[in-house]
């Protein structure tokens, strides 16, 4: 019981006294905000000029960056395709590069489907 009374007294004293630095921090932030914007907000013309300058700088930086091309190309991948000995539909182009959708061979007869195979050189 004595312990609970002690904690309650501590809680009440902490809430009453509070954080004295909190008011000082608020005042400091208000002063900084006033110093930053003491000239008032920018006019629309100034904002547009500033935006144009930023866009020009941005475009110059991106043009000189050699990594943008390689980054875009590294994410490119071929469309999904069927590998060797995988079923396909007659006349479809779903087989990977270098493979053709050919008539079923021995085991393909059982499944009645075509398979992606390398073309026979002849």
Curated annotation (Swiss-Prot):
GO terms for cellular component: extracellular region. One of its GO terms (molecular function) is toxin activity. Expressed by the venom gland. It holds the Pfam family Toxin_22. It is found in: Secreted. InterPro entries: Toxin_22 (IPR012627). Coiled coil: none annotated. Keywords: Cleavage on pair of basic residues, Disulfide bond, Ion channel impairing toxin, Secreted, Signal, Toxin. Disulfide bonds join 81-96, 88-101, 95-116. It comes from the Eukaryota. This is U19-hexatoxin-Hi1a. It comes from Hadronyche infensa (Fraser island funnel-web spider).
């Amino acid at each position: 019981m004595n312990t609970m009374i002690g904690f309650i007294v501590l809680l009440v004293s902490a809430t009453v006294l509070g954080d004295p630095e909190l008011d000082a921090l608020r005042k400091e932030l208000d002063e900084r905000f006033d110093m930053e914007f003491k000239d008032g907000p920018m006019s629309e013309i100034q904002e547009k000029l500033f935006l144009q300058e930023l866009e020009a700088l941005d475009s110059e930086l991106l043009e000189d960056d050699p990594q943008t091309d390689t980054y875009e190309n590294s994410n490119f991948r071929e469309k999904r395709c069927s590998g060797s000995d995988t079923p396909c539909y007659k006349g479809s182009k779903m087989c990977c590069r270098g493979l053709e959708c050919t008539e079923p061979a021995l085991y393909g007869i059982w499944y009645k489907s075509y398979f992606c195979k390398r073309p026979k050189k002849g």
